Swiss-Prot record:
Homotetramer. Belongs to the catalase family. The gene is CAT1. It is an enzyme of class 1 (oxidoreductase). GO terms for cellular component: cytoplasm; glyoxysome; peroxisome; plasma membrane. GO terms for molecular function: catalase activity; heme binding; metal ion binding. The keyword Oxidoreductase applies. The lineage of its organism: Eukaryota, Viridiplantae, Streptophyta, Embryophyta, Tracheophyta. This is Catalase isozyme 1. Its main location: other. Keywords: Glyoxysome, Heme, Hydrogen peroxide, Iron, Metal-binding, Oxidoreductase, Peroxidase, Peroxisome. It is found in: Peroxisome; Glyoxysome. It catalyses: 2 H2O2 = O2 + 2 H2O.
Amino acid sequence: MDPSKYRPSSAYDTPFLTTNAGGPVYNNVSSLTVGPRGPVLLEDYYLIEKLATFDREKIPERVVHARGASAKGFFEVTHDISHLTCADFLRAPGAQTPVICRFSTVVHERGSPESIRDIRGFGVKFYNRGGNFDLVGNNVPVFFNRDAKSFPDTIRALKPNPKSHIQEDWRTLDFFSFLPESLHTFAFFYDDVCLPTDYRHMEGFGVHAYQLINKEGKAHYVKFHWKPTCGVKCMSEEEAIRVGGTNHSHATKDLYDSIAAGNYPEWKLFIQTMDPEDVDKFDFDPLDVTKTWPEDLLPLIPVGRLVLNRNIDNFFAENEQLAFNPGHIVPGIYYSEDKLLQTRIFAYADTQRHRIGPNYMQLPVNAPKCGHHNNHRDGAMNMTHRDEEVDYFPSRFDPCRPAEQYPIPACVLNGRRTNCVIPKENNSKQAGERYRSWESDRQDRYINKWVESLSDPRVTHEIRSIWISYLSQADKSCGQKVASRLTVKPTM
């Protein structure tokens, strides 16, 4: 008998109940007892198995992006960019690749309302012929901090107070007052875009700069942009409160119902590219994750479309156990030197091993749909059937060999060991440009949100003054309006 043929699956359900070992269960209502009253006998094996399974049916929730929903579909290339990359799934117009996509809130817990103000996660897993590519992004193009040493503190400052488990503005504003680089992300976080109407009506961004490499080995830095074909729609604070009070899973329901009705969500993929030789021509560091690239100088290039046309079959198997990792790239795409990206390559795989187990890549939703081979073996919950005798490399008894070399960036890196910030911080310019691009009513909502947060009674005069100074450096009128509402003068 093929040992993998009858692995647990609904495809092999029997018409009657069984234990996990396949033994028949003739009573699933009453426990085995001594007489009608009891006590209950420990020999009721199915009762013990049922309770023990129930006790363990949940896995640790994600430390970030815990609240989310997934859907399946395809990505189709619509424009030729083969001169920029040799990535197989981008090889030519018409090429299609199966995908699974997960949307989420970032800070809040599993089961929390999806209408709460938060950045939204936008992760896409491409099941390519040459391996999985995970584009793990958000609905805003920047992040709060550029160095991963601050990342755990960033998340803790955004999450609830560890003493009371209450989310409080004073904690957030206290921490980020030490990180002026966060101001640009706050220009999104306190803006309308962090109250999206649902997942279908929001943009997505790869956030980090990556690199595209063509078959000649020429590299370009790249940023990825997802644009919804149905447009961007956001809620007001009042609408968000109403929606969240009516249905805490409104965005999940909207995504599921839309696909079930044949109204398939669709996004267009665009990229921005930059020649590495041009990196030093800007007044900011293009590899700084707190910055966007100017579209007037680096215009959006159309690439393809993402269509979600299938709902997931099982929420636990295809959402809770779904694992993304920015380290999963394919030939033709490579990492940039972005400090935060470099550390996410490790951190994502590490958290999945903790959350799901060391063999999480064997789960069907995470496993590549192409052939794959290495000597990673065994471990808890190993599900592969392997009968080879050679589990080392190299060997004259095993014909397996290294893959052919594919192009990677050939840049020369040098410098001293150092712990320092980047030279071109320029923390306020882009935040100010974004603020000035809005209509007056949108500016007013942004100012109102700052006033509300800075009015937290535990926010000190010093912290208020620092933030008003940051806002004034971005846009003088913005800082003045917030200051006048709070009767505070900048001190920086």
